[in-house]
C-alpha cells in the first residue's frame, strides 16, 4: 500500500472539537476575531474548526492567505512566496492563523512577523500538525492538533502535488509513491 494511516477520521474530529472548545473559551470576550486560513492545506481543518467554535457575542470573520514553500517537493524549499494576501485590515483585531502543518517553522515565523506589523490586537496560531524534530526556529503555537514524526503527511487537506487532499484521515505518503 502507498500510504499508512497516522490519525483516523475519528481521532481528527475529536481533536478538532477539543481545539474549538479551547478557542471558544479563550476568545469569549473578544469583539472581533479574524480566522486566517493558510491555503490550500488548511482548508479542511479550518472548515471543521470554524464549526467547532461558538462565539455568539463576537464578530468572527474569515480571511485567507496563500503562502508556499513547497511546490511539488516533499520538503520545504525555504523560499517563502506570498501568493494571496489578506483582503481586509486586521488592525486592532484578534487574529488566529489556521495552518495545516509546521515543518521547519520558517514559513509560520515569517507569516507571524508580517501580520504583526499590521497591528492586530493579538496574534496566535492554531496548527493541525507539527514536526517538532524538524523545527529550525521556535514558533509559538497556541492551539496544537498533533505532533508527528519526520514523515510526509497527506490527507485531510494536505497534498502531494495536488493529490490526496480529499482523504478523510491523515496518512504517511510512502516513498515509492514519489521516488522514481
Curated annotation (Swiss-Prot):
Location of the active site: 103 (proton acceptor)
Name under which the protein is recorded: Hypoxanthine-guanine phosphoribosyltransferase
Major enzyme class: transferase
The protein's role, per its UniProt record: Converts guanine to guanosine monophosphate, and hypoxanthine to inosine monophosphate. Transfers the 5-phosphoribosyl group from 5-phosphoribosylpyrophosphate onto the purine. Plays a central role in the generation of purine nucleotides through the purine salvage pathway.
Pathway involvement of the protein, from the record: Purine metabolism; IMP biosynthesis via salvage pathway; IMP from hypoxanthine: step 1/1
UniProtKB keywords: Cytoplasm, Glycosyltransferase, Magnesium, Metal-binding, Nucleotide-binding, Purine salvage, Transferase
GO MF term set: guanine phosphoribosyltransferase activity; hypoxanthine phosphoribosyltransferase activity; magnesium ion binding; nucleotide binding
Subcellular location: Cytoplasm
Transferase listed as a keyword: yes
Keyword Cell division: no
NCBIfam families: HGPRTase
A single cellular component GO annotation: cytosol
InterPro entries membership: HGPRT (IPR050408), Hxn_phspho_trans (IPR005904), PRibTrfase_dom (IPR000836), PRTase-like (IPR029057)
Pfam families named among the record's database cross-references: Pribosyltran
Protein encoded by which gene: hprT
Origin: domain of life: Eukaryota
Residues reported to bind Mg(2+): 159
Reactions it catalyzes: IMP + diphosphate = hypoxanthine + 5-phospho-alpha-D-ribose 1-diphosphate; GMP + diphosphate = guanine + 5-phospho-alpha-D-ribose 1-diphosphate
Binding site for GMP: 40, 99-107, 131, 159
UniProt remark on cofactor binding: Binds 2 magnesium ions per subunit. The magnesium ions are essentially bound to the substrate and have few direct interactions with the protein.
Entry-linked PANTHER family: HYPOXANTHINE PHOSPHORIBOSYLTRANSFERASE (PTHR43340:SF1), HYPOXANTHINE-GUANINE PHOSPHORIBOSYLTRANSFERASE (PTHR43340)
Amino acid at each position: 500500500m502507498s500510504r499508512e494511516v497516522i490519525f483516523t477520521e475519528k481521532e481528527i474530529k475529536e481533536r478538532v472539537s477539543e481545539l474549538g472548545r479551547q478557542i471558544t473559551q479563550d476568545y469569549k470576550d473578544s469583539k472581533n476575531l479574524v480566522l486566517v486560513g493558510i491555503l490550500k492545506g488548511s482548508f479542511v481543518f479550518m472548515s471543521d474548526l470554524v464549526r467547532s467554535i461558538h462565539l455568539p457575542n463576537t464578530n468572527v470573520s474569515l480571511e485567507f492567505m496563500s503562502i508556499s514553500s513547497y511546490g511539488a517537493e516533499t520538503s520545504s524549499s525555504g523560499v517563502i512566496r506570498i501568493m494571496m494576501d489578506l483582503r481586509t485590515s486586521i488592525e486592532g483585531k484578534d487574529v488566529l492563523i489556521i495552518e495545516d502543518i509546521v515543518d521547519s517553522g520558517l514559513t509560520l515565523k515569517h507569516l507571524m512577523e508580517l501580520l504583526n506589523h499590521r497591528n492586530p490586537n493579538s496574534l496566535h496560531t492554531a496548527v493541525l500538525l507539527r514536526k517538532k524534530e524538524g523545527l529550525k526556529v521556535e514558533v509559538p503555537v497556541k492551539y496544537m492538533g498533533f505532533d508527528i514524526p519526520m514523515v510526509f503527511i497527506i490527507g485531510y487537506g494536505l497534498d502531494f502535488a495536488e493529490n490526496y487532499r480529499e482523504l478523510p484521515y491523515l496518512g504517511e505518503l510512502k516513498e515509492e509513491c514519489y521516488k522514481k
